[in-house]
């Protein structure tokens, strides 16, 4: 062990290593001095070089070997040239018979050649194994040089990759929005007008529709006869103000009717039946929704033909059709006009039977196959729908026909305007996030703040839900997340500071 003290001229009068013992390794120590023996002296290099005698014998032998190799190569080339000349003469005189004679002098020439001085260098110049065999006849040469014929049973296509039918799948995809737009273009105004005339002629005189706006909107109502998606098992008729809506189970299987003579005699088939039965159901539901409209500003309640109990479906009060005995879910025979009351006594709202409480007039909307849209149940949404312009109302009706509710479509249109594609994108993103379990109010906040980034929306919703469970206010959570760009730690510190200050 040793102790080391640094000089006072560097660190002053004291050092941090004073009286501190530490060990120094051998490799850091100064090497010991080695003394040369007495009389040892190194020779002078220049004197050694001057006294050295170098004869360059190896270099001279190498040059001689190179010259001998050149002579051997020239002798080989001369022998080959003479052999070719002799072979050409023999071929011109005797033809193929001279082949065996030519090979002997060639081998004799190669045998009489002197052996190479350096076999290693000589072997690098020529390789007898790879020397091609010489032939005499030109026909034989053409036969040898011609490519080999492929076998008849060989098919190169057997070794190629099989075409995957899914490779071209992307080329066959369609634009869903364009297809939906094309589907919603067709109209069935004349069909609805004929149906309305035939039914109102059989009804009472007080059930005649006098509202020209209702008739005009009825002619413009569009119907799609191709199912867009499988419904939820119910055919729901539209709810009109105080009129209670009727629900029909999809399990009911009734025989089809060739002519539509009475609203009670219509058959409501299964939802996966053919297009003609689906057309009958749609025409009936559309006519029923428009026949309950009054020319003034009121509607009457829907009266059942016999006693029936009100059931509740999806949160809305519905009144079943006891005349069709749909509660049992079994098949019921077709009811004719002689067995059932006329259309006017059941569903057409007359002026005398209208309740004292007036309701605003509703313009009939477009209905699709898979779902008949409900009128907005919220009075505020109902009044907002009436305040829209015709183009805005048409935009709302188009999106509602795709299966969305009025409230969601109106909220989306307030944020995105009348652009149907942007409304559909907004509703699709909103529905996906709600299906993942997020609060709809938080989803709307996320779509408003981070609509362009799905990753930031998910991060924002997760932090909002987490901070909301901690008990913080939504307003403060939104402010701090926007301020700190979804930074969890900084946002939590800010929220804690605000909570402590309050």
UniProtKB/Swiss-Prot annotation:
Residue positions, PTM Phosphoserine: 146, 205, 289
Tissue distribution: Ubiquitous. Highly expressed in heart, liver, brain, kidney, spleen, skeletal muscle, stomach, testis and lung.
Pfam families per UniProt: UBA_9 (PF22567), UBAP-1_UBA2 (PF21267)
GO-annotated biological processes: protein transport; ubiquitin-dependent protein catabolic process via the multivesicular body sorting pathway
InterPro entries listed in its UniProt record: UBA, UBA-like_sf, UBAP-1-like_UBA2, UBAP1, UBAP1_C, UMA
Basic and acidic residues bias locations: 80-100
Cellular component terms (Gene Ontology): cytosol; ESCRT I complex; plasma membrane
Keyword Oxidoreductase included in the entry's annotation: no
Summary of subunit composition and partner proteins: Component of an ESCRT-I complex (endosomal sorting complex required for transport I) which consists of TSG101, VPS28, VPS37A and UBAP1 in a 1:1:1:1 stoichiometry. Interacts with PTPN23. Interacts (via UBA domains) with ubiquitinated proteins.
Full protein name: Ubiquitin-associated protein 1
